[in-house]
Amino acid sequence: MTVRTRFAPSPTGFLHVGGVRTALFSWLYAKHHNGQFILRIEDTDRERSTQESVQAILDGMAWLGLNFDEGPYYQTERYARYQQVAQQLLEEGKAYRCQCSKERLEALREAQLAAKEKPRYDGHCRNQSLPDSGIPYVIRFRNPDGGIVSFHDEVYGDIHVDNSELDDLILVRSDGHPTYNFAVVIDDWDMKITHVIRGDDHINNTPRQINLFKALDAPVPVFAHLPMILGEDGKRLSKRHGAVSVLQFKELGVLPHALLNYLVRLGWSHGDQEIFSVQEMITSFDLKNVSRGVSSFNYDKLYWLNQHYQKSDSPESVANALQWHFEQAGIDLNQGPDLKDLVAVQAERCKSLAEMCQISQYFYTDTIEYNEDAVKKHLRPVVLEPLMVLHERLKALDEWKNDKIQECINDVSLQFDLNLGKIAQPLRVAVTGSGTSPSIDMTLALLGKNKSIKRLEDALEKIRARASVV
């Protein structure tokens, strides 16, 4: 048997991290078993489905590298198939037309609630054999009267539901559109899905779907339902917790494989291992180690993983991802150091690519913004003479290399009997605008000689101006 899994999002909003984890687990299970992963867009909600959401799903999957073997399939392109199967079920007596009005159904619901009963359809039209007479109707599934629906969930174990708890669900609405529970069964059947891995909010749908599979003499897939992801406050993950859309994490500067590594550990474990390459995930993943407990999304842990990959990945690969952030900021990368050289010195200083871009822009701009507090603290008249001497020493360098730069700084600090920091910090503020940067020799080396000398000259003018005011 070829394992076939699917990811079936609805394009009614952004691609949520909970959906991404579902996609990841389905993708990993298929890859682990040398199977196939299918993408299906469940776009039957005509009012809420948008092309923008479809594109966000496709872009998010592409960014994460969750490639699909088939698809994307669209439910709106399969309406004829749903109608065909609905007609087949009608002809076989496994479904029936229901002409109950909204008013009758609402009155039934209110009466059941008043009697403290579970609201459910009472089968009023079940045995009436109503013809297609032009009166609006829905098509309902004739759920078995007795017996128990039993299935083994790969996460939650054996589940049993009495058919008396299930009413006759609607398959096709009066406007001809299929319901979710009907369309998803036909799709999984036609697409030969062997394993349905999805959120545990679908557990209650499963007995109904199993009955429908059996009515169609279709093979019933294996089910695995994944527990919910919560925020750290124990509430359902939402925008108030921070980024929840996969593409927001890209904007925040999270590497795609760092996000995958983090998500795979939300509800799944492989011993005590925390760090997984994508290939290690594929090799190790199984469903038996998926936890039944809910998971909490911890942003600090995600950024810890992200920084790990920033440091352990090759500078070239990190630079490729970092380039997008500079492009979004409108920074011309031709005006500064090679990105891979920047990554080599900044990766361990930043928790994300967005932060790395933000604190490194001075390497690529002609002018810099000075932090006024840093200027007041470090660009004082007392450092004017040492910086003037350092300016001449640096300007005279034939080789603009770290060791030569550091040698100049050391010599000037000795000449003026100053602690090294008393020279390095004013120099840092002069060339970066702030009091934080990589080591000062590395900072100047990356900036290049011309830009470093020009900024030092500008800072000297700033100090002279302050001195004249004083």
Curated annotation (Swiss-Prot):
Give the record's subunit note: Monomer.
Disulfide-bond pairs as recorded: none
Which named protein is this? Answer: Glutamate--tRNA ligase
**In the UniProt record, does the keyword Endoplasmic reticulum occur?**
no
Gene3D superfamilies to which the protein is assigned, alphabetical: 1.10.10.350, HUPs (3.40.50.620)
Q: What does this protein do?
A: Catalyzes the attachment of glutamate to tRNA(Glu) in a two-step reaction: glutamate is first activated by ATP to form Glu-AMP and then transferred to the acceptor end of tRNA(Glu).
Q: Where is this motif: 'HIGH' region?
A: 9-19
What species does this protein belong to?
Legionella pneumophila (strain Lens)
- Subcellular locations according to the entry: Cytoplasm
- The residues the entry assigns to the signal sequence are none
Q: Which GO terms describe its biological process?
A: glutamyl-tRNA aminoacylation
One of the record's GO cellular component terms: cytosol
**Keywords on record:** Aminoacyl-tRNA synthetase, ATP-binding, Cytoplasm, Ligase, Nucleotide-binding, Protein biosynthesis
